[in-house]
Curated annotation (Swiss-Prot):
PANTHER family in the record: NADH-UBIQUINONE OXIDOREDUCTASE CHAIN 5
Source organism (scientific name): Zea mays (Maize)
Gene Ontology CC terms, in alphabetical order: mitochondrial inner membrane
Transmembrane regions listed in the UniProt entry: 131-148
Catalysed reactions, semicolon-separated: a ubiquinone + NADH + 5 H(+)(in) = a ubiquinol + NAD(+) + 4 H(+)(out)
Function: Core subunit of the mitochondrial membrane respiratory chain NADH dehydrogenase (Complex I) that is believed to belong to the minimal assembly required for catalysis. Complex I functions in the transfer of electrons from NADH to the respiratory chain. The immediate electron acceptor for the enzyme is believed to be ubiquinone.
Gene giving rise to this polypeptide: ND5
Membrane topology of this protein: Multi-pass membrane protein
Subcellular location per the Swiss-Prot or TrEMBL entry: Mitochondrion inner membrane
Name of protein: NADH-ubiquinone oxidoreductase chain 5
Length: 180
């Protein structure tokens, strides 16, 4: 006798922790009652299922009922046409084209390369071929660098890196809008 009454506990031997907050015993026995009655019902239905199946197949009403529930009702077609396609269209036009693709084109490699190409074209228009123009351009470029590198300790509390980022992003947006 393997089980030796181990699943069964008398109500007088219940511990408070196991009594599931003082529920009545009949409440705890409901799963056993339903399991036993369900098993016996399934066994009895299985015995008469062959007779019921023959009666179901030969009856005109049951045959019509079966064919009614077996046909396609086009719920999936209605859902696809009206709900799913509108969500997919919105997702493609807003999130993909405007946000993802637009941000990648403006801030991604194509936007950066386009910006630098336009900047190089503008700078190349400044070239005249004279040495003193190049010397003057080098002087103009090195003056702020030398000035700010000497004064960085006193200016670092006034300079905010977020403003530099905003300036950089706005220049990309301005270049993108000017090309359109």
């Amino acid at each position: 006798n393997f089980w030796a009454n181990s699943p069964f506990v008398l109500p007088k031997n219940e511990i408070l922790a196991e009594s599931e907050f003082a529920a009545p015993t009949i409440t705890k026995l409901i799963p056993i009652l339903f399991s036993t009655s369900g098993a016996s019902l399934a066994y009895n239905v299985n015995l008469v299922a062959d007779q019921f199946q023959r009666a179901f197949q030969t009856s005109t009403f049951c045959n019509r009922l079966y064919s009614f529930f077996n046909k396609r009702w086009f719920f999936d077609q209605v859902l696809n046409d009206f709900l799913v396609r509108s969500f997919l269209r919105f997702g493609y036009s807003v999130s993909f084209e405007a946000l993802d693709k637009g941000a990648i084109e403006i801030l991604g490699p194509y936007g950066i390369s386009y910006t630098f190409r336009r900047l190089a074209e503008r700078i190349s228009q400044l070239q005249s071929g004279s040495v003193y123009h190049y010397a003057f351009a080098m002087l103009l470029g090195s003056t702020p660098f030398v000035t700010f590198s000497r004064m960085w300790d006193s200016l670092s509390s006034w300079v905010d890196s977020r403003s530099s980022f905003i300036l950089l992003v706005s220049s990309f947006i301005i270049n993108k809008s000017s090309q359109e």
